[in-house]
Amino acid sequence: MTDRIRPLIAGNWKMNGLKASAAEFEAMLAGAAEVTGKADLLVCPPATLLAAFAEKTRGGKAVAVGAQDCHAKASGAHTGDISAEMLADAGASAVIVGHSERRADHGESDVVVHQKAEAAWRAGLVAIVCVGETQQQRDAGLTLEILRGQLTLSLPEGSRADNLIVAYEPVWAIGTGLTPTAGDVEQIHSFIRQLLIVRFKEQGARMRILYGGSVKPSNAAELMAVANVNGALVGGASLKAADFLAIAKGC
């Protein structure tokens, strides 16, 4: 973790959660005071829960609410899609774009991710841009090449530390229980940092780089201690308040 960059623990609930899940979110709000000295907290529930969760954070609660995806357009004939403006109106402060599951399940290209990041800014949201390699790409020794291409095309000009966060998520580690070694994470996050600095100068030096991929309480402290790891994008472990807060305590 880079000391001068305040870490962010972002929970991605994916396609999980019904109205009854509000109890877990309320438990996160109740326990957030214990970790506010260590990290910022963000929870990205499914769109059906976004407004209700955002309402619970009114009055300056220590957990922000975000979204998992947005359409590039502000409105129009796009059945089933949700615009960044709608997310902001519902109370979101950030939105994940380019998650590997969106790239794989919906064929989203780097160009589409770029457009969605710009849409997030248009609505006043922070864009959390995800990048990462598959197992096949890793085995072929292509990890850094893949990341360079994704970062080059997915990150818009105008990216700043206050409007964009990069999340490195090795696809082979998501939901598998597998994680790269601390040494691997350090190498890759250092590579990402250097690319950000070359392109965005001082802003690139200050951008948060999150690690995502089977982050859990048992490995959080080790991962958060790695240089240039400025927090985590947490999947399954963010569904339980106790696990989510324990990960934040590892910062």
UniProtKB/Swiss-Prot annotation:
It is an enzyme of class 5 (isomerase). The keyword Zinc-finger does not apply. Keywords: Cytoplasm, Gluconeogenesis, Glycolysis, Isomerase. Substrate binds at residues 12-14, 175, 214, 235-236. Its main location: cytoplasm. SUPFAM superfamilies: Triosephosphate isomerase (TIM). It is found in: Cytoplasm. It comes from the Bacteria. One of its GO terms (molecular function) is triose-phosphate isomerase activity. One of its GO terms (biological process) is glycerol catabolic process. GO terms for cellular component: cytosol. Pathway: Carbohydrate biosynthesis; gluconeogenesis; Carbohydrate degradation; glycolysis; D-glyceraldehyde 3-phosphate from glycerone phosphate: step 1/1. Pfam families: TIM. Its EC number is 5.3.1.1. InterPro entries: Aldolase_TIM, TIM_sf, TrioseP_Isoase_bac/euk, Triosephosphate_isomerase, Triosephosphate_isomerase_AS. The active site is at residues 99, 169. It catalyses: D-glyceraldehyde 3-phosphate = dihydroxyacetone phosphate. PROSITE patterns: TIM_1, TIM_2. Involved in the gluconeogenesis. Catalyzes stereospecifically the conversion of dihydroxyacetone phosphate (DHAP) to D-glyceraldehyde-3-phosphate (G3P). Homodimer. Belongs to the triosephosphate isomerase family. This is Triosephosphate isomerase. It comes from Bradyrhizobium sp. (strain ORS 278).
